[in-house]
UniProtKB/Swiss-Prot annotation:
Gene (UniProt): ispG
Keyword field: 4Fe-4S, Iron, Iron-sulfur, Isoprene biosynthesis, Metal-binding, Oxidoreductase
Keyword Transit peptide part of the UniProt annotation: no
UniProt GO BP: isopentenyl diphosphate biosynthetic process, methylerythritol 4-phosphate pathway; terpenoid biosynthetic process
Name assigned to this protein: 4-hydroxy-3-methylbut-2-en-1-yl diphosphate synthase (flavodoxin)
Pfam short name (any one): GcpE
Keyword Metal-binding: yes
S-S bridge residues: none
Gene3D superfamilies xref list: Dihydropteroate synthase-like, Sulfite Reductase Hemoprotein, domain 1
Organism: Ehrlichia ruminantium (strain Welgevonden)
Domain of life: Bacteria
Cited NCBIfam families: ispG_gcpE, PRK00366.1
Needed cofactors: [4Fe-4S] cluster
InterPro entries in alphabetical order: Dihydropteroate_synth-like_sf, IspG_bac, IspG_bac-typ, NO2/SO3_Rdtase_4Fe4S_sf
Amino acid sequence: MQCDFVDRILNEYDLLNAIVYRSKFTHEVKVGDVIIGGNNPIVVQSMALGGSGDVYQDAREVLELAQAGSELVRIAINSDKAIKSVPYIRDVLINHGFNSKMIIGCGQYEIARLVKQYPECALALGKIRINPGNIGFGDKRDKNFEDIIEFAIKNDIPIRIGVNWGSLDKYLAAKLMHDNSLRGTPDPDYVVLRKALVISAITSAKHAEKVGLPANKIVISCKVSKVRDLISVYTMLSKICDYPLHLGLTEAGSGVKGIVGSSAGISYLLLHGIGNTIRVSLTQQPGESRTNEVKLCQEILQSIGLRNFSVQVTSCPGCNRTNPKYFHQLVSDVNKYVADRMSVWKNANPGVENMTIAVMGCVVNGPGESKHANLGISMPGYGERSVAAVYQNGEKLCTLEGNNIFEQFVSIIENYVSIYYH
C-alpha cells in the first residue's frame, strides 16, 4: 500500500511538471535586440509615466526604467510634442548603451495622424501598440487602423494589438450581448465580455495580416483588471493563436493589492506556458518610482524559476527562538549589500545572478536551509551558543563570532563570487 502511494506521488509529480513547464509555441517577434516569443526568455516591459512636458525629464524617466532592467519601455504618443521627443529619448538610451529600438509608442485615435505627420520621429520606435477599441470611431476606425499597419509594413516595425477591458469596441460588445440574449441559456455578462476581448484581438490581428503585416510582426494583449478574467482570456488566446502574448493586469491598483493580483495572475499563466512578455501596472504612491514595477516583474520571473536577475537571499521570518536584534539586522544588511553590489558583479562576475544566499535565525531550519544555498549562515537563537555557522556548497565552512559577523560574512560572500563566477 505504501509503495503504491509513493509510486502515485512520483508519477503525479512527473505529469505535473510536464504540464506546467511546457511553453506554448508562438511566433518570434523581434524588437531591436529583443526577441519576444518562441523559446526566448520572458521579456520585462514597463511604461513611463511621462506627461511632464519636459523632454529631458521624460528621457530621464525612460532611462531609469531601462537601468532598472526594463527591456522594453512604452511611452504615450498622444501629441505632436510627444512624438517629436522620441528620437531624443532614443539617443539618450543609445548613449547609455541600451537597445536602440526599445521604445514602444502607444497611442489612441490620434496616433495614426501623428505617425503620418512625423514619420521620421516614428521610425525611432521599436514597436507600436494600438488599441482596436479606440484607434478611431465610425468610418475612421478601419482607415486609422490600416494606416498604422501600412506604416509598420513599410518600415518593418512590429505591432502590439492591445485590447483593453475599459475601452472594448462598443459595437462588438453590443452585438455579442444582443446575440447572447437570444440564446436559450445566455452566458453571464462577464463571459460574453471575455469572449468579446478575444474576438476583438484575434479579428484585428487577422485584419492586420490581410493588409500585409506578417504574423511574426504581431504581439497580442487583452488587459483586464480581475485575476480570473485574465486567466480565462489568455487561456482562450493561447488555444486559438500562435501570436506572442503580452501579459498584465490593467488597473491593478496600488500597494499590496496590486502586487498580489498581478503576481497571482501572471505567475499562473507563465507556469502553464502562456505568455511571452510581462508588465506590472501599479498605481504609485506619491513620490514612488515606477522602477518598482520593473523589480516586481523580475521578482515574479525569478520566484517561479523562469529567469534570474539577482543573487537570491533566502531568510526565515524569525520566531521566539531567534534573536531579532541581531538576526533581522543581518538579513537587512545582507539584502542591501547584495543590491548595492549587483551592478558591479553582473559586469565582472557572469552568472552571479544564479547564486543563492541563506540567512537563517536559529538551529531548527538554519543548517538545512543553508546547505541548500550556495552560501548560508545560521545565526544563534535564544539559548544557543553565540556562534554563527557558515555553509558553502552544502558543507560546513566555518563558524563566526564576535561583533562583526556581518563584515566577516560579506568577506566570505565576496570570496565565493570571485572564485565561482569569473
